[in-house]
């Protein structure tokens, strides 16, 4: 099937993805460093509309002002030449040894102050480049030993830092939205705000909760053995899906960062169906479809760009399959038989309270639970139809 990306698809990639040199805990890099300017041009060629980056992805840590200015100027020139945008930026608070116990929640107060300053500088650059979202991944915010971290105090410090970032953005007129990226573990033994639910609960405790949402990642949620599509549906319900990271993962193990759809394909299908078709047949999410993956260590740069194209192609193919699934009359019949739409009908009648419900004998005293319990919902048939559409068998 021929599919072609357009800017309206809003596909974006992290500079750290295609630029990953494939160095891991057990082996050295298998690829040379990628020039950010080349990354911009290559991503534009394959149909991306945006590129994102950590501060240290673009400007190496410790660079002097002259070097920094030169790199940023070259990057901006490439953006102008290609039309690529920077929809989101983020900050590296996890690589340098100073962050070995975290950034915002380090036990060392001086590290916490340094971390906030580092993020403020990245916010300045992000605003200069037109970014609308700042992602916050607390990869080192956590502990290996319960006795080593006062979690209550750590959450206080987390809140203190995020409140300051929001105030800075508003005072400077940046208008940024902030998206917390959850992850259960790795690199820390246990990371604070490990799942989408934890992060959504946390942002309600901030001074400006309307400015904060989440950036869930496929692999991160599935590392906790959670259903990613259900998590995204709840984030949408809370109106807290500010950004999304797409990749592939085979269940609860280390963070694999595979190409999107190269892990749990059926869940990827249901996710795209949710994002594109929503609960009412209209797109449920209008933000970037951001790929946060790692091109396999086995690949050279030809393979890197093939993997980048694979992410786009997988998403577009799943989008087409989901569209066909929703348009199939047999699927519509199966959905009706399964009473999927009936869940939108309020359980109580208009104006009804517990007194009226208690007075309704048909709801309990005269209710034939055995007869209703004997009826099937037809969920297996519905799922089979979904799989057949996914496989292109219908």
Curated annotation (Swiss-Prot):
Gene Ontology molecular function: magnesium ion binding; xylose isomerase activity
UniProt enzyme class = isomerase
Please write the reaction equations for the catalytic activity of this protein.
alpha-D-xylose = alpha-D-xylulofuranose
List the cofactors: Mg(2+)
Q: Which UniProt keywords apply?
A: Carbohydrate metabolism, Cytoplasm, Isomerase, Magnesium, Metal-binding, Xylose metabolism
Q: Where is the active site?
A: 54, 57
Residues recorded as binding Mg(2+) 1, renumbered to this chain, are 181, 217, 245, 292
Pfam families assigned to the protein according to its UniProt record, in alphabetical order: AP_endonuc_2
Where is it mostly found? cytoplasm
Q: How is the cofactor bound?
A: Binds 2 magnesium ions per subunit.
Per the UniProt entry, the Enzyme Commission number(s) are 5.3.1.5
Which cysteines share a disulfide bond?
none
Q: Name one GO cellular component term.
A: cytoplasm
Belongs to which family?
Belongs to the xylose isomerase family.
PANTHER family referenced in this protein's UniProt entry, alphabetically: PTHR48408, XYLOSE ISOMERASE (PTHR48408:SF1)
Q: Tell me the subunit arrangement.
A: Homotetramer.
Q: What is this protein called?
A: Xylose isomerase
């Amino acid at each position: 099937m021929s599919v072609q990306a357009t800017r309206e698809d809003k596909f974006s990639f992290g500079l750290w993805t295609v630029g990953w040199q494939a160095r891991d805990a057990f082996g050295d890099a298998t690829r040379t460093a990628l020039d950010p300017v080349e990354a911009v041009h290559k991503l534009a060629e394959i149909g991306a509309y945006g590129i994102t980056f950590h501060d240290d992805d673009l400007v190496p840590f410790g660079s002097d002002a002259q070097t920094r200015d030169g790199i940023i100027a070259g990057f901006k020139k490439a953006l102008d030449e290609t039309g690529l945008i920077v929809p989101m930026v983020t900050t590296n608070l996890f690589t340098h040894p100073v962050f070995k116990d975290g950034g915002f929640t380090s036990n060392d107060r001086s590290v916490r102050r340094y971390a906030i300053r580092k993020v403020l500088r990245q916010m300045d650059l992000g605003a200069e480049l037109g970014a609308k979202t700042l992602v916050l991944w607390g990869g080192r915010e956590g502990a290996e030993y319960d006795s080593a971290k006062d979690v209550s105090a750590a959450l206080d410090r987390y809140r203190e830092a995020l409140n300051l970032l929001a105030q800075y953005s508003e005072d400077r007129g940046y208008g940024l939205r902030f998206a917390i990226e959850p992850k259960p573990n790795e690199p820390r033994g246990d990371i604070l705000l490990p799942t989408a639910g934890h992060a959504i609960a946390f942002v309600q405790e901030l001074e400006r909760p309307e400015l904060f949402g989440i950036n869930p990642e496929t692999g991160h949620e599935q590392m906790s053995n959670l259903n990613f599509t259900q998590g995204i549906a709840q984030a949408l319900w809370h109106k807290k899906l500010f950004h999304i990271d797409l990749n592939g993962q085979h269940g609860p193990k280390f963070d694999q960062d595979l190409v999107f759809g190269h892990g749990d394909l059926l869940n990827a299908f249901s996710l795209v169906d949710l994002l594109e078709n929503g609960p009412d047949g209209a797109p449920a999410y209008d933000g970037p479809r951001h790929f946060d993956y790692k091109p396999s260590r086995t690949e050279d740069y030809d393979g890197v760009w093939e993997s980048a194209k694979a992410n786009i192609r997988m998403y577009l193919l799943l989008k087409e399959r989901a569209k066909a699934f929703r348009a199939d009359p047999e699927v519509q019949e199966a959905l009706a038989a399964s009473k999927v739409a009936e869940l939108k009908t309020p359980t109580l009648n208009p104006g009804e309270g517990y007194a009226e419900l208690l007075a309704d004998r048909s709801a309990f005293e005269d209710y034939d639970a055995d007869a209703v319990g004997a009826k099937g919902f037809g969920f297996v048939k519905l799922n089979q139809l979904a799989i057949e559409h996914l496989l292109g068998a219908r």
